[in-house]
Curated annotation (Swiss-Prot):
Function field: Associates with the EF-Tu.GDP complex and induces the exchange of GDP to GTP. It remains bound to the aminoacyl-tRNA.EF-Tu.GTP complex up to the GTP hydrolysis stage on the ribosome.
Gene Ontology, cellular component aspect: cytoplasm
Domain of life of the source: Bacteria
SUPFAM superfamilies: Elongation factor Ts (EF-Ts), dimerisation domain (SSF54713), UBA-like (SSF46934)
Protein name: Elongation factor Ts
Family under the similarity heading: Belongs to the EF-Ts family.
Primary subcellular site in the record, as a coarse category: cytoplasm
Organism per entry: Histophilus somni (strain 2336) (Haemophilus somnus)
Places the protein is found: Cytoplasm
Pfam families in the cross-refs: EF_TS (PF00889)
Length: 283
């Protein structure tokens, strides 16, 4: 039996909105597998929806650069928001982005090696760890970019109007689509969701045959919700992104979205407990 830690229960609560005891029970039944626990809770109705993305906890910045027929996003991380605004840290981020632009296709390992001396010197000066975490490129006939507060960066590739593609980039930043079109959703993802929806319907008392028919409509809604062109456009929710793009004679072939700290869990410290520990006052 896997150890069910308080941190694991806390993460499941945050991702499902369920109570502490329900989360602990689900984790025990799933032998500590949080993804399986989420699936089981959805099937039983305890969790109406579950976010699959990891918690965003690390600090840092995203930088974006546009070249000829391509764009690049880089992410640099640090430990605190204070350092994320430091001119030295921001200067390093800009240097890394400029290098990635000038050396198309460079890998994260190459960037880390090339800037190691500068990174180490800055760490020694500021006293906080820093990492060059990610670099991603996107090619296309037309490239548009959107940067939201240096925390979320988006590149969109397509054809037509760059101005319209930039609006779509803003939508991607806000709505977090996972695919371009509904038909792009992988068979594995579709089948996984279909089985969950069938179990939900059966658990509600529906016969299996009826449950399977009901799920077909839900699956169309699901693939639309996770795909860019199937989502309601944030600037005009009365139309889908796909319909809007058609109306402005523009199309999207691909996109990239990076958000600072995706998938990194930062240890949360109890400030009062830390002060008590330092002062020796545990009362």
């Amino acid at each position: 039996m896997a150890e069910i830690t308080a941190a694991l229960v806390k993460e499941l609560r945050e991702r499902t909105g369920a109570g502490m005891m329900e989360c602990k029970k689900a984790l025990v039944e799933a032998n500590g597998d949080i993804e399986l626990a989420i699936d089981n809770m959805r099937k039983s109705g305890q969790a109406k929806a579950a976010k699959k993305a990891g918690r965003i906890a690390a600090e840092g910045v995203i930088r974006v650069r546009i070249g000829s027929g391509f764009g690049v996003l880089v992410e640099l991380n640090c430990e605190t928001d204070f350092v994320a605004k430091d001119t030295g840290f921001l200067g390093l981020a800009d240097e890394v982005a400029d290098y990635a632009l000038a050396n198309k296709g460079t890998t994260i390992d190459t960037l880390a090696t090339h800037f190691e001396d500068k990174r180490a010197a800055l760490v020694a000066k500021i006293g906080e760890n820093m990492t060059i975490r990610r670099v991603q490129y996107l090619e296309g006939d037309v490239i548009a970019q959107y940067l939201h507060g240096a925390k979320i960066g988006v590149l969109v590739a397509g054809s037509g109007s760059e101005e319209e593609l930039r609006k779509v980039a803003m939508h991607v930043a806000a709505s977090k689509p996972e695919f371009v079109n509904p038909e792009d959703v992988s068979a594995e993802v579709v089948e996984h969701e279909r089985q969950i929806q069938i179990d939900i319907a059966i658990n509600s008392g529906k016969p299996k045959e009826i449950a399977e028919k009901m799920v077909e409509g839900r699956m169309k809604k699901f693939t639309g919700e996770v795909s860019l062109t199937g989502q309601a456009f944030v600037m005009d929710p009365s139309v889908s992104v796909g319909d809007y793009l058609k109306s402005v004679n523009t199309s999207v072939t691909n996109f990239i979205r990076l958000e600072v700290g995706e998938g990194i869990e930062k240890v949360e410290e109890d400030f009062a407990a830390e002060v008590a520990k330092i002062t020796g006052n545990n009362a």
